[in-house]
Every structure is written in structure tokens, then in C-alpha cells.
Curated annotation (Swiss-Prot):
It holds the Pfam family Cytochrom_B_C. The cytochrome bc1 complex contains 11 subunits: 3 respiratory subunits (MT-CYB, CYC1 and UQCRFS1), 2 core proteins (UQCRC1 and UQCRC2) and 6 low-molecular weight proteins (UQCRH/QCR6, UQCRB/QCR7, UQCRQ/QCR8, UQCR10/QCR9, UQCR11/QCR10 and a cleavage product of UQCRFS1). This cytochrome bc1 complex then forms a dimer. GO terms for molecular function: metal ion binding; ubiquinol-cytochrome-c reductase activity. Binds 2 heme b groups non-covalently. Its cofactor is heme b. It is a multi-pass membrane protein. Belongs to the cytochrome b family. Component of the ubiquinol-cytochrome c reductase complex (complex III or cytochrome b-c1 complex) that is part of the mitochondrial respiratory chain. The b-c1 complex mediates electron transfer from ubiquinol to cytochrome c. Contributes to the generation of a proton gradient across the mitochondrial membrane that is then used for ATP synthesis. This is Cytochrome b.
Length: 380
């Protein structure tokens, strides 16, 4: 078996990725989220496949087909709620995974990091289009509002929006193409994940102290296979509690009303995992400015390697930058809360302050903190 594992053209790739892979001996549970994201992706593809068997991407029947899945299909309610809440679990793992990368300076592995940013954009696009498919009120108006933002692009904006809509409003053509894209994107994401792993295995994993761990490596199996399995069980436990006991807690009640172009919901807001970006978008009174801020809120991750001023890679031994980091985390919670509130005083001013703080901490305060720490430790 050993010979087969190491010699077979296909199996040896798996062997070098998950079995005989040399891994640092001290990586903590923060390194579990990569495998958990893989698990989330598999759950989403499988549940999505079964939903697609019963779903009809047509404005007249989409809402009814989702109702039909929940009422008439064997365990359809479970598949539907697993898919909806699976997206939430996916984003929780994503945010923790990115947060881990920021804390431990993993952005210095530039190819892996940039691939991760592309993956983040792809997952966000997939989730947005998936939210449109049930064709409830929030689906329809969310699609209308977000696609409409592209009209802020000078000169080609309006043409671009109508091209994406396939008409003069969000309608049958829009729903059909969103379903097509929503179906294909997870497979593209799977391919990108393999590239992400390919880049990661060029350098090997980072570790909590940020030092080179080549002198002290252990095989991935059994040490990290069993550790990942424990993480998977904890995730599945939380996931099933959410799905079976509180399936609608993260959803919007408005989406149980069929889409009606003649009736606008009082508060149009996206799913919770987009609220921080939505708050940043709304905090700028100019349409184009808001769109740019929205894109930059994620794209800013790409310049993190350039903003790294410290002589140490991780934040493990850097209390000043640590403080900045946790203020940033708190700021993201504030933005998430504001994104779900109506546009009125005092929420607007809180949102603007939190948006400024978000960019200021990443671009100004954390790099300065790194330089101060270098001076304190006399590392210059």
C-alpha cells in the first residue's frame, strides 16, 4: 500500500497534499478553518445539486418551487435549510480564516493570499446570486439595488446594468442567468481552491510564532487529519443545531413574501455576512464613491503585504498591533450592526465613523504600530 500511495500518479498527489505533507508541529486550531471551508464547500455543492433538481428558474414559478421543495420533497425542508444556513457557516469560517491570516501575517505568502482574495470575491458573488433565486421580496429588491450600483460607472454604467439584467429591470432573464452562474461558480471555486492549495504547498504553512518551521515538521496524517476531523465534528454540531432548531434566525422575514416589483420593502438589506460592506457602501453619500469604498473594503486585503512594517511576521509578540487588530474586529461588528439599521440619525454618523476607522486602522494605525514596536524592541 505504501508503494502504491507514493507511486500511483493520482494517489501520490493526494499523498503529498494530505498524508505525507510535512506540517509545522505547533499550528493551533486557527489552522483548522481551511479544511472546514472545504467541508462547507462540499456541503453547499451537494445540497445545491439536490435543490437544483426541484427548482425552476422562472419568475412565475421560482417562489412556488422553493415552497414545493420545503413541503412536498422528501426531506426537502432539510436540504433547503442546510443550503441556506450552510452559506452562513461558510462565511463564518471564511471571516475567521481571513482574520487568522491577518493576525499571523500569512499575507506574506503573496500568491496564496491573492488567490484567497479572488476566492473571497467568488464566494461573495455566488452567495449574492443564490440569495436572488428564491424570488422573495428581499431577493428581488436586493438584486435590483446591488446590480443598480454598476450604473455609477461613468459612461458605460447604464448600458452595463441593462446588459446584466437582460432587459430594463430585474426580470425573468436576470433570474435565469443568475441561476446559471450560481450553479457554475462553486465548481470554478473548487478549481481555484486547488490552485490556492498548490500555492500554499509551495511554501508550506505558516505557524503561530511566524518563525521558519523547516527544522521541526511532522506528517499531516495522523496528527492533523484527526485534528481536522475534530474541527469538522464541532462545525457539523453547530451547523445542525442552527439548521434544525433555528433555521430562520439569520434569514429575512420579507423573503417569505413573493417578489413584487410594485411594492418596496421598508428596509432593503442583504444577508448578515454582507452587512459590514453594505454599511461602508451607505456611509458615503456619493454613489460612485460608495461603490469604490465597497470594493476597496475587500480589495484592501491585497495591499496588506505592502503595509507590513514590523520585523516580526505574526502579532503573537506585538501587543500594540494586537490592540489595533482587536479594535478592527470590534469595528467590523459595529459595521455589521449598522448595515442592518435604517439610514437615519444616529446610525448614519456611527456608520461613517466606523467606516473611516476600518480603513484608518488597516492603512495607517497598524503600520505605525509595527514601526513603534520595532523601535521598542530595537529591531531597526
Amino acid at each position: 500500500m505504501t508503494i502504491m500511495r507514493k507511486k500511483h500518479p493520482l494517489i501520490k498527489i493526494i499523498n503529498h497534499s494530505f498524508i505525507d505533507l510535512p506540517a509545522p508541529s505547533n499550528i493551533s486550531s486557527w489552522w483548522n478553518f481551511g479544511s472546514l471551508l472545504g467541508l462547507c464547500l462540499i456541503i453547499q455543492i451537494l445540497t445545491g445539486l439536490f435543490l437544483a433538481m426541484h427548482y425552476t428558474p422562472d419568475t412565475t414559478t421560482a417562489f412556488s418551487s422553493v415552497t414545493h421543495i420545503c413541503r412536498d420533497v422528501n426531506n426537502g425542508w432539510l436540504i433547503r435549510y442546510m443550503h441556506a444556513n450552510g452559506a452562513s457557516m461558510f462565511f463564518i469560517c471564511l471571516f475567521l480564516h481571513v482574520g487568522r491570516g491577518m493576525y499571523y501575517g500569512s499575507y506574506n505568502m503573496i500568491e496564496t493570499w491573492n488567490m484567497g482574495i479572488i476566492l473571497l470575491f467568488a464566494v461573495m458573488a455566488t452567495a449574492f446570486m443564490g440569495y436572488v433565486l428564491p424570488w422573495g421580496q428581499m431577493s428581488f429588491w436586493g438584486a435590483t439595488v446591488i446590480t443598480n450600483l454598476l450604473s455609477a460607472i461613468p459612461y458605460i454604467g447604464t448600458t452595463l446594468v441593462e446588459w446584466i439584467w437582460g432587459g430594463f429591470s430585474v426580470d425573468k432573464a436576470t433570474l435565469t442567468r443568475f441561476f446559471a452562474f450560481h450553479f457554475i461558480l462553486p465548481f470554478i471555486i473548487t478549481a481555484l481552491v486547488l490552485v490556492h492549495l498548490l500555492f500554499l504547498h509551495e511554501t508550506g504553512s505558516n505557524n503561530p510564532i511566524g518563525l521558519n518551521s523547516n527544522a521541526d515538521k511532522i506528517p499531516f496524517h495522523p496528527y492533523y487529519t484527526i485534528k481536522d476531523l475534530l474541527g469538522a465534528f464541532i462545525l457539523l454540531m453547530a451547523f445542525m443545531i442552527l439548521t434544525l432548531f433555528f433555521p430562520d434566525i439569520l434569514g429575512d422575514p420579507d423573503n417569505y413574501t413573493p417578489a413584487n416589483p410594485l411594492n418596496t420593502p421598508p428596509h432593503i438589506k442583504p444577508e448578515w455576512y454582507f452587512l459590514f460592506a453594505y454599511a461602508i457602501l451607505r456611509s458615503i453619500p456619493n454613489k460612485l464613491g460608495g461603490v469604490l469604498a465597497l470594493i476597496l473594503s475587500i480589495l484592501i486585503l491585497a495591499i496588506m503585504p505592502l503595509l507590513h512594517t514590523s520585523k516580526q511576521q505574526t502579532l503573537t509578540f506585538r501587543p500594540i498591533t494586537q490592540t489595533m487588530y482587536w479594535i478592527l474586529v470590534a469595528d467590523l461588528f459595529v459595521l455589521t450592526w449598522i448595515g442592518g439599521q435604517p439610514v437615519e440619525y444616529p446610525f448614519t454618523i456611527i456608520g461613517q465613523t466606523a467606516s473611516i476607522a476600518y480603513f484608518a486602522i488597516i492603512v495607517i494605525l497598524m503600520p505605525i504600530a509595527g514601526m513603534i514596536e520595532n523601535n521598542i524592541l530595537d529591531l531597526n
